[in-house]
Amino acid sequence: MSDFDRNYAATTRGVGADRAVIDAGLRAYMIRIYNYMAMGVALTGVVAWITFNAAVTETGGKLALTSFGQMIYSGPAVIVLFLGTLGLVVLISWRIDKLQPATALTLFMVYAGALGLMLSSIFLTYTGTSITRVFFISAASFGALSLYGYTTQRDLSPIGSFLMMGLIGLIIAMVVNIFLQSGPLGFVISAAGVLIFAGLTAWDTQKIKEMYDPNEDGTITGRKSVMGALTLYLDFINLFLFMLRFFGDRR
């Protein structure tokens, strides 16, 4: 009996040690993802602010575009920026299994910077104070939703399928409203966008957590970290933009 007790205790300690190693590895993996995401968000914000200040002059309380502003906010540059950012995110997503982690991270940062160029135009529409306020509201909401996705024992995959269908419908509605310019439809789109990306934040966090494998080598884990960071970055940026349509103060 004493031999059984000793063997059982040794086995229990071994399982506990393995779980501790997995928990430590998972924690490091998730922290790396959040750090990469934060780097991307910070870079987007800095580039957007610098671009706006280079693109706009203020005279008598009124904003006017500089020659640089006219170039990036109108004409072919807008299309080039849109297609360039779309191409980058598709490249990272489709080629992630072939890219080295450092290369994937570099492409992610290039994408974040390019998106900062595009998003700098929000400063033309909304006041800086309201943008800052909505950013912190979005950050707090994102943090709470991501924490829920990380800690919940509930399987969110059925919700994820529903959210992806909702996202497709949202994109179609946004394209339609470009031509209709309907205020009520715009309000519905904004509300749906907030709800969809709130749900996606929790779902993606759970999915990223479940992708962790302590037996994989560092290269594969590094690729997953970059892809996870890009996914959460896009969730946050879209959540912020849809919230800005609700709570932002227009100039």
Name these PLM-found stretches.
Residues 1-251:
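A hydrophobic alpha-helical transmembrane-helix feature that marks the membrane cores
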